[in-house]
Amino acid sequence: MEGNGCGGSGATPRGVVGMHWAPVVTSPPSPQPPFLPPAPCRPDVQMQQQGGLTCLKLGKRPCFWGGDGAGQVAQGSGGGGGGGGGGSADQGKRKEKAATAVPVVPRCQVEGCDITLQGVKEYHRRHKVCEVHAKAPRVVVHGTEQRFCQQCSRFHVLAEFDDAKKSCRRRLAGHNERRRRSNASEAMARGSAHPHGMPVLGHGFPPYGLPTSSAGALSLLSSARATGPWLMPTPDISARSSAALDELIAENRAALLSWQFFSDRQPPPAGRPTGRSPGSETAGGWHAHLQARPPPPGAGGQHENQSGHVTLDLMQATTAAGGSGAPFRPVPARPPKEGGDAGCTSDAWTPSPMEGARVV
């Protein structure tokens, strides 16, 4: 027992020394890391994993990018390499299938028509109908008699068409309604263009001899109003009527003078008034006014303005048209207007009260 104890006691310090050997050593122990670093990952795998987080890859398995352990990352990288090989193989198979696939050629959908639509228009290719059956009044599609509507670009049953129309009833009704609406708006616009809402007569031209508007008549003597707006805004209807009558009288006198100029001093046909006496042939007409000396101030006739243009004054004294008709007397000149008629005399010639009104 003692020997054993001695032996034990002798072995005890040795064992104690052996148990306390590590702290007694003077050399410092090597520091142990708190955790193992993750396994190094290849740069290409790391780029693929980062790309999987920032982009959409539909139809592919996403990468496992987590911080749970390095083993999963390593397994994911290994599996990614295998998956990359499988993906490239799948892509190669898809390319082979696409190369070997025959393109579908569009054909006419009418039963019994096997015409390919390769060299036809894009319209017929898109709607799968040939040009002949697109205009046919009756075809068989899906076992039913139908007709191709040109506005809907599709086939309808025959009950949706009126007689031999190429468009269905619904589209034709909408088209007619739009046309009616546009015609009504145009008519309203034409009516609103007139001061009193009077519609345009005939084909847009007034009857011969009537003024072109209720506000006044177009004058042949006023060149400024011929190029610009010539409507005369007047307060009442009586003033407008007087202005229109003045314009018509002036136009009639201008026509008479032009006829005298082109008559070339020939005797007129029987029954046609000449508007001048037999002895006034040399005095009347335009030849008497083509003189180098300008007429005296206040006398009617032809005068030359500063620009060199020759102007015929129609309100001259009745030297040419005073033989057979009633004597006319000029009305006092009206004040100049704002429209540019400065310097023009009155366009009206009124008969004397003893002779009465007489308009040629």
Swiss-Prot record:
InterPro entries: SBP-like, SBP_dom, SBP_sf
Zinc finger residue extent: SBP-type: 105-182
Listed Pfam families: SBP
Tissue specificity field: Expressed in young panicles.
Region (Disordered): 74-98, 172-196, 261-306, 318-360
GO molecular function: DNA binding; zinc ion binding
Compositional bias ranges of the Basic residues kind: 172-182
Cell compartments where the protein resides: Nucleus
Residue spans of biased composition, Gly residues class: 74-89
Predominant place of localization: nucleus
Motif (Bipartite nuclear localization signal): 165-181
UniProt keyword list: DNA-binding, Metal-binding, Nucleus, Transcription, Transcription regulation, Zinc, Zinc-finger
Residue numbers binding Zn(2+) 1: 108, 113, 130, 133
Cited function: Trans-acting factor that binds specifically to the consensus nucleotide sequence 5'-TNCGTACAA-3'. May be involved in panicle development.
Record PANTHER family: SQUAMOSA PROMOTER-BINDING-LIKE PROTEIN 4 (PTHR31251), SQUAMOSA PROMOTER-BINDING-LIKE PROTEIN 7 (PTHR31251:SF222)
Protein name per the record: Squamosa promoter-binding-like protein 7
